[in-house]
């Protein structure tokens, strides 16, 4: 990567009159803002359909797009909806936070109207789209139709064992016929999502901006991916997990974090030439220009927690695929760039794998001043081949970090970066990242706005209230883009 910078902004966080960010006008406006601010990258969170808990890291599919992001206004412009139909539902009353309950209640009803009007009209284009995505789309559409049929339960709870275990093609054909209308509906939603996404991506590229996507290392148990290809996961004969993913206890979490995702059967994947991963990265490469691999350390070794344990305490480290997988990915996708999310638990094995991969790792400025464990995140310790962040979606915005951090940590930041009230605490830390030798610097949009309490995206290990933060209309001003542009140019990062 050449010296550059970008902004982290989830699609869900874009302003919208429809309760959640979409691929519509606000997304195009944000691309314009990035250009005006001299930025080179738009970093996003995963784009997949969210399930219970609303986390983009727990999706029903590793390939599908989130139907919530389909923009109603664009559907209206295409003759699939009316403006009155788009405005009628209650999309939530708080413009700062997504009300996922309201979205779930009303979005699919609205989108079903678009489906009824567009399915036959767009038949030829939908057929071409389905053919291009034949490797994953039929399983996903059938999976979602079956979930709806069985009260949105995970496939592990479906009462028909033949369907749950995918005993034969006949049982799948039975449900394809029984649930034909819903299979078509979920197919059409993906057609709409990817049509809008492709148009937005092309516009973003026209502005000289590249897109950094986020790829969760694990997929959800409640997903079409595990249901369709259970042979690639550590499951028993009844398709119950033998062990699940998590991370061990650390300074921040006494019990560790029990994620609950099924673990990969790396031997089975290796025997298949890592075809599952090649297909997954190929899908992501059609969305993004750069792919951030979440929890990179899981490629070196991963924390396996016996299934049924109440916490992640009693897990153990098991060797991952290492360079066997990474060499395959680098060889298959020479045009793609990868970022390794290598935060936490620094070990010689992870450091060696990062070096051998050739991928840049991550540095988080908020961690740099933590008196418990700075882990080499201070800018003077950087080498150029890394990505510097003010914080990630899992961190407090800088203004909130200032309130929450230990006084000695804040004092360290003030002394190290010569922070002043005149410049602004958050601007001084942004300056520290911008001026560092890191090839790429990325800040959360909340940090540029100086937002504090109530503006955090996610608190790991907690339930409820996460993934809801939204930008308000008009918050991204011309004055702000001018100030960002000036700092970006000053430190040699301007696009």
What are these regions (language model features)?
Residues 186-219:
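Conserved, well-ordered alpha-helix/loop/beta-strand core segments that scaffold catalytic motifs
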Residues 42-46, 204, 210-216, 284-298:
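Short acidic catalytic loops
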Residues 10, 54-194, 219-442, 446-453, ...:
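Alpha-amylase-like alpha-glycosidases and glucanotransferases acting on alpha-linked glucans and related
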Residues 35, 197-205, 330, 354-355:
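Surface-exposed amphipathic alpha-helices with a cationic face
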């Amino acid at each position: 990567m050449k010296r550059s910078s970008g902004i982290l902004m989830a699609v869900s966080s874009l302003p919208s009159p429809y309760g959640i960010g979409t691929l519509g006008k606000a997304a195009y406006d944000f691309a314009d803002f990035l250009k005006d601010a001299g930025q080179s990258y738009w970093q996003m969170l995963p784009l997949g359909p969210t399930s219970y808990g609303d986390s983009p890291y727990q999706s029903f599919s590793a390939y599908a797009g989130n139907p919530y992001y389909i923009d109603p206004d664009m559907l209206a412009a295409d003759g699939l909806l009316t403006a009155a139909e788009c405005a009628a539902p209650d999309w939530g009353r708080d413009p700062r936070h997504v009300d996922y309950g309201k979205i779930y209640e009303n979005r699919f009803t609205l989108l079903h109207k678009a489906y009824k009007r567009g399915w036959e009209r767009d038949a030829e284009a939908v057929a071409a789209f389905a053919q291009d995505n034949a490797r994953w789309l039929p399983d996903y559409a059938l999976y979602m139709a079956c979930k709806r049929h069985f009260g949105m339960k995970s496939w592990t709870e479906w009462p028909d064992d033949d369907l749950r275990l995918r005993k034969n093609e006949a049982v799948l054909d039975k449900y394809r016929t029984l649930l034909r209308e819903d299979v078509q509906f979920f197919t059409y939603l993906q057609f709409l999502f990817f049509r809008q996404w492709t148009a937005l991506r092309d516009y973003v590229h026209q502005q000289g901006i590249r897109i950094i996507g986020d790829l969760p290392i694990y997929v959800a148990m409640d997903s079409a991916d595990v249901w369709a290809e259970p042979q690639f996961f550590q499951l028993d004969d009844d398709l119950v997990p033998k062990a699940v993913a998590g991370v061990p206890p650390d300074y921040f979490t006494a019990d560790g974090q029990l994620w609950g995702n099924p673990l990969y059967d790396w031997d089975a994947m290796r025997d298949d030439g890592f075809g599952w991963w090649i297909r997954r990265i190929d899908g992501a490469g059609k969305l993004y220009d750069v792919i951030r691999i979440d929890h990179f350390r899981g490629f070196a070794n991963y924390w396996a927690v016996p299934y049924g344990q109440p916490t992640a305490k009693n897990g153990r480290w098991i060797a991952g695929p290492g360079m066997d997988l990474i060499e395959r990915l680098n060889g298959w996708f020479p045009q793609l760039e990868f970022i390794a999310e290598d935060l936490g638990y620094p070990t010689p094995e992870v450091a060696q794998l990062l070096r051998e991969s050739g991928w840049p790792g991550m540095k988080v400025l908020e961690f740099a001043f933590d008196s418990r464990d700075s882990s080499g995140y201070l800018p003077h310790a950087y080498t150029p081949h890394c990505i510097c962040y003010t914080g990630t979606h899992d961190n407090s915005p800088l203004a909130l970090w200032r309130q929450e951090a230990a006084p000695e940590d804040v004092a360290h930041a003030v002394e190290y970066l010569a922070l002043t009230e005149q410049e602004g605490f958050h601007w001084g830390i942004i300056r520290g990242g911008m001026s560092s030798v890191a090839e790429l610097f990325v800040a959360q949009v909340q940090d540029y706005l100086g937002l504090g309490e109530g503006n955090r995206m996610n608190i790991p290990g907690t339930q409820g209230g996460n993934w809801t933060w939204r930008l308000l209309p008009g918050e991204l001003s011309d004055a702000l883009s001018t100030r960002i542009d000036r700092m970006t140019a000053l430190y040699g990062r301007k696009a």
